[in-house]
């Protein structure tokens, strides 16, 4: 079975507290985009076999897809094995939920392959054990996510919007960013409820004008390239630009393909990982 695992961007990201176990409590609007990994998932006699087109992708339990497969097999007493080939297109350590997207795709595919009568809600409760972005990746589309990411409210679709992604040539540790965020003072927070209302009313201009990601207070301060990329996007008439997740990828919305392509080709001169895509 071939399945697509879609990346995401954060239209807003706010940290509102911290649980006793150390996980941060969040309010986020998340959006799927048409940049995806392709997973070829097949039944084998036993075990979990992971392969990939990329050498730097782990093939053991450090891989979220591996952990998702094991959790599903243990939970539903699967007596067969599974092989997963990951054709990786989503950049890693980028703030795009590349690993979580793969984990979510594995859970959904295994539900179908092994014909298990399991709801999305049950998969979400499983998935959150191994990755806070997995619940959203199971649901996809446009959604408001709360808790540590497991409380999902579907929003009106914002599909078809043109986005250019620029990932600087370094990765960022999510754990490091959240640890450093705890030391931040005087943080500007997004109007999460106002943004949710705007999304549901189709007020896209309000949405792009009011995007806030509080984690920029860490990543964009540590890496000056993030603000440089955002400034360049605005020079090329982006209608809204922000860092996704813990970074370092910057996504920028454009009104039309022509302007997006100008910016795309300009950024390709400097960065290896630049993509034109759309929201889905």
From Swiss-Prot:
Entry EC number(s): 2.7.1.148
GO biological process assignments: isopentenyl diphosphate biosynthetic process, methylerythritol 4-phosphate pathway; terpenoid biosynthetic process
Alphabetized UniProt keyword annotations: ATP-binding, Isoprene biosynthesis, Kinase, Nucleotide-binding, Transferase
Pathway(s): Isoprenoid biosynthesis; isopentenyl diphosphate biosynthesis via DXP pathway; isopentenyl diphosphate from 1-deoxy-D-xylulose 5-phosphate: step 3/6
Binding site residues for ATP: 91-101
Single annotated GO MF: 4-(cytidine 5'-diphospho)-2-C-methyl-D-erythritol kinase activity
tRNA-binding is among the record's keywords: no
Superkingdom assignment: Bacteria
Catalytic-site annotation from UniProt: 8, 133
NCBIfam families given in the database record: ispE
Function recorded in the entry: Catalyzes the phosphorylation of the position 2 hydroxy group of 4-diphosphocytidyl-2C-methyl-D-erythritol.
Family: Belongs to the GHMP kinase family. IspE subfamily.
Protein name per its UniProtKB record: 4-diphosphocytidyl-2-C-methyl-D-erythritol kinase
Lineage: Bacteria, Bacillati, Bacillota, Clostridia, Eubacteriales
């Amino acid at each position: 079975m071939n399945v697509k695992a879609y990346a995401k961007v954060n239209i807003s990201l706010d940290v509102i507290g911290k649980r006793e176990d150390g996980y941060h409590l969040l309010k986020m609007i998340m959006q799927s985009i048409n940049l995806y990994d392709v997973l070829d998932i097949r039944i084998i006699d036993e075990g979990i076999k992971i392969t990939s087109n990329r050498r730097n992708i782990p093939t053991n339990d450090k891989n979220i897809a591996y952990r998702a497969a094991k959790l599903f097999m243990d939970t539903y007493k699967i007596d067969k094995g599974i092989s997963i080939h990951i054709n990786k297109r989503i950049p890693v350590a980028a703030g795009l939920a590349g690993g979580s997207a793969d984990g979510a795709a594995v859970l959904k595919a295994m539900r179908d392959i092994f014909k298990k009568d399991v709801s999305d809600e049950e998969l979400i409760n499983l998935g959150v054990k191994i990755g806070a972005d997995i619940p959203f990746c199971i649901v996809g589309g446009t959604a408001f996510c709360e808790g540590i990411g497991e409380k999902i409210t579907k929003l009106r679709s914002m599909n078809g919007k043109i986005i250019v992604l620029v990932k600087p040539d370094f990765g960022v540790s999510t754990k490091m960013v959240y640890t450093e965020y705890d030391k931040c003072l005087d943080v500007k927070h997004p109007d999460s409820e106002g943004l949710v209302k705007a999304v549901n009313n189709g007020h896209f201009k309000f949405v792009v004008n009011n995007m806030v990601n509080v984690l920029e207070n860490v990543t964009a301060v540590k890496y000056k390239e993030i603000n440089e990329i955002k400034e360049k996007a605005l020079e090329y008439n982006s209608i809204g630009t922000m860092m996704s997740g813990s970074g370092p990828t910057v996504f920028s919305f454009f009104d039309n393909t022509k302007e997006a392509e100008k910016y795309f080709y300009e950024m390709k001169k400097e960065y290896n990982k630049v993509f034109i895509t759309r929201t889905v």
